[in-house]
From Swiss-Prot:
Gene Ontology CC, one term: cytosol
Comment block on domains: The antiaggregation activity resides in the serine-rich region and the C-terminus.
Span of domain J: 3-69
Protein name as annotated: DnaJ homolog subfamily B member 8
Subunit structure: Interacts with histone deacetylases HDAC4, HDAC6, and SIRT2, HDAC activity is required for antiaggregation.
Chaperone listed as a keyword: yes
GO molecular function annotation: Hsp70 protein binding; protein folding chaperone; protein-folding chaperone binding; unfolded protein binding
Name of the gene: DNAJB8
InterPro entries for the chain: DnaJ_domain, DnaJ_domain_CS, DNJB2/6-like, J_dom_sf
Keywords for this protein: Chaperone
Biological process (GO), any one: chaperone-mediated protein folding
């Protein structure tokens, strides 16, 4: 039986945050919907990753697992009350999909609903959870995460009207991640309508800024590609 720490790729001394980050990364990688050409293997790995997270993310279950090991845990089981050992009765793991959606704030991160949720997280816990999950899940895009944070700041600023929209396309028939995100922010600055659009696809970030419908600047991975000088 696989070692749950090895399944998540973490040390036995891993912190709860390390466990969460590992789960985000592996669950997104092996979700069956992201692996249509390798669904059977993906389902097995996704289930195992879910099992590992379910045990190691719970301090009591993790402590018992550390003492008994994976084989004993699976053979024994979970407690019906907090006063019994989880090895008293047969343990049934939760549905991997339920854990996955719960982890991402009750939403499917591959759906439009996830991306259309409010991003002004400072006013509510749910948005903050999405931002945290998103940050760790796509930590390989630092420029994108910086952009994501700036969107939160815009949403909480006063004296401007800001709207957000975003789209995600999951799945890939090739070896690439197939991840694409489009986020746009519109606000009024000194009487001018300024729209900032950020597009992240295949590890590259493109930022377009329009003022009153006119394209003003374009940057790719932080490097300026186009800039219109105001002739006024």
């Amino acid at each position: 039986m696989a070692n749950y720490y090895e399944v998540l790729g973490v040390q036995a001394s891993a912190s709860p945050e390390d466990i969460k980050k590992a789960y985000r990364k592996l669950a997104l990688r092996w979700h069956p919907d992201k692996n249509p050409d390798n669904k059977e293997e993906a389902e097995k790995k996704f289930k195992l990753v879910s099992e590992a997270y379910e045990v190691l993310s719970d301090s009591k279950k993790r402590s018992l697992y550390d003492r008994a090991g994976c084989d004993s845990w699976r053979a024994g089981g979970g407690a019906s009350t907090p006063y019994h050992s989880p090895f008293d009765t047969g343990y049934t793991f939760r549905n991997p999909e339920d854990i996955f959606r719960e982890f991402f704030g009750g939403l499917d991160p591959f759906s439009f609903e996830f991306w259309d949720s409010p991003f002004n997280s400072d006013r509510g816990g749910r948005g903050h959870g999405l931002r945290g999950a998103f940050s760790a899940g796509f930590g390989e895009f630092p420029a994108f995460m910086e952009a994501f944070s700036s969107f939160n700041m815009l949403g909480c600023s006063g004296g401007s009207h800001t709207t957000f929209s975003s789209t995600s396309f999951g799945g890939s028939s090739s070896g690439s991640s197939g991840f694409k995100s489009v986020m746009s922010s519109t606000e009024m600055i000194n009487g001018h309508k300024v729209t900032t659009k950020r597009i992240v696809e295949n590890g590259q970030e493109r930022v377009e800024v329009e003022e009153d419908g006119q394209l003003k600047s374009v940057t790719v991975n932080g490097k300026e590609q186009l800039k219109w000088m105001d002739s006024k």
